[in-house]
Amino acid sequence: MSGHSKWSTIKRKKGTLDAKRNKIFTKLIREISIAARMGGGDIDSNPRLRLAVNKARVANMPKDNIEKAIKKGIGDNMGSEYFELTYEAYALYGVALIIKCLTDNKNRTASEVRSVLSKSGGSLGAPGSVSYMFHKKGLISYNLDKYHEDEIIELALEAGAEDIYSEGSQVEVITSADNFESVSSILRTKFEEDIAEVALVPESKVALDKEQMDKVLAIIEKLEDCDDVQEVYHNLEIVDDIC
């Protein structure tokens, strides 16, 4: 997705789902189980679980798998204790990365992330070296094949949305992190979203030529392939039709 949207990585990420479905499902199941363990198995009262389940639905995970993951989280058979880790790093050409991980072995995860970066020309940064370049925002995306754009925009603005982007068959509602739950709840009374999540959005993006962009994307994808890596946020400007 190119153009004015701040969420230009969504189509690229969704396009990789089929090729990496099993690994993606494993990560989503882990996130669902941990969210259920931390906040309970009711998605209406557990925002983190609701976000995790929404991601699983977007990835076309079977309902049975989602329910099993929730039951695992609230049961006594969770297995290993998992830790949330965040790494700040740089890829090539000054592109900043924030790498979110869930792991049962901190040393293994640190070694794997460091190895991917060092072999690709990137490097780990100190805490705070990158995070100031990003801020949390809520994203709620709707398919215009299902709903009328004007109705979504009207209700989103009434609910307190910060911004609204329209591109192709999608409308993307942007909220502050604090207002995400309230805005999404109001919109959910009339519309069913395709995507609803809180993400780290860069203050500005780094524009590169196609060869450079492809090299950075390769690093990001290698990190995403790591078993313990849940999300990789970056400030690379992705342009599909770059010359």
Curated annotation (Swiss-Prot):
GO biological process per UniProt: regulation of DNA-templated transcription
Keyword Amino-acid biosynthesis attributed: no
Lineage: Bacteria, Pseudomonadati, Spirochaetota, Spirochaetia, Spirochaetales
Record keywords: Cytoplasm, DNA-binding, Transcription, Transcription regulation
UniProt similarity note: Belongs to the TACO1 family.
Pfam families registered for this protein in UniProt: TACO1_YebC_N (PF20772), Transcrip_reg (PF01709)
Main location: cytoplasm
Organism domain of life: Bacteria
Organism: Borrelia duttonii (strain Ly)
Alphabetized SUPFAM superfamilies for the sequence: YebC-like (SSF75625)
Name of this chain's protein: Probable transcriptional regulatory protein BDU_30
Recorded GO MF terms: DNA binding
Location relative to the cell: Cytoplasm
The UniProt record lists the keyword DNA-binding: yes
Coiled coil: none
GO cellular component entries: cytosol
